[in-house]
Amino acid sequence: MSLATLDTAQHPSLPSASETLFKAKAAKKLSFEQIAQHIGRNEVATAAIFYGQAKASPEDIEKLSGLLTIPYDALEERLSGFPDRGRSVEMPPKEPLIYRLYEIVQNYGYAYKAVLNEKFGDGIMSAISFSTKVEKETDADGNNWAVITLRGKWLPFSRF
């Protein structure tokens, strides 16, 4: 199994905790799925903690500290603040997989908007009251497919 690692030269805007977490993850040879199971979170949410895009709870910090053998105080100091979200990727993204996700929004964004507006009315899908998951699906011919589910609370625009 190949593991996600971090090259800090390619991600200079990530918080200092990211490098610490990724080094420990590599040393322990753990996947995000394994770490997520240990801390009781979704694997995408767990990866978001590593990239500084999600807030870690005190319980998350305690479990990460034990699993990754990182002193609790060092992790708590770096992970207990509020994340500075949205700064980890330059726009448009250059990394091919992240660019494909960006391209999906470019190509289908207005189609998603139209269908969502027809189904729910004038509003937005929350990225705060939100969950996501990634699954692997294999078809009858043996082709692998990525299935990404986005689940956000619908927030109607207020009339004022």
UniProtKB/Swiss-Prot annotation:
GO-annotated molecular function: cyanate hydratase activity; DNA binding
Protein name, per record: Cyanate hydratase
Function of the molecule: Catalyzes the reaction of cyanate with bicarbonate to produce ammonia and carbon dioxide.
EC number from the UniProt entry: 4.2.1.104
Gene that this sequence comes from: cyn1
Catalytic class of the enzyme: lyase
Alphabetically ordered keywords of this record: Lyase
Native organism taxonomy: Eukaryota, Fungi, Dikarya, Ascomycota, Pezizomycotina
GO biological process terms held by the UniProt record: cyanate metabolic process
UniProt KW Lyase keyword: yes
Catalytic-site annotation from UniProt: R100, E103, S126
Family: Belongs to the cyanase family.
Catalysed reaction, written as an equation: cyanate + hydrogencarbonate + 3 H(+) = NH4(+) + 2 CO2
Disulfide topology: none
SMART domains, per the entry: Cyanate_lyase
UniProt feature coiled coil, ranges: none
Taxonomic source organism: Aspergillus niger (strain ATCC MYA-4892 / CBS 513.88 / FGSC A1513)
UniProt-listed Gene3D superfamilies: Cyanate lyase, C-terminal domain (3.30.1160.10), lambda repressor-like DNA-binding domains (1.10.260.40)
InterPro entries: Cyanase (IPR008076), Cyanate_lyase_C (IPR003712), Cyanate_lyase_C_sf (IPR036581), Lambda_DNA-bd_dom_sf (IPR010982)
PANTHER family attached to this UniProt entry: CYANATE HYDRATASE
CDD domains cross-referenced by the UniProt entry: Cyanase_C
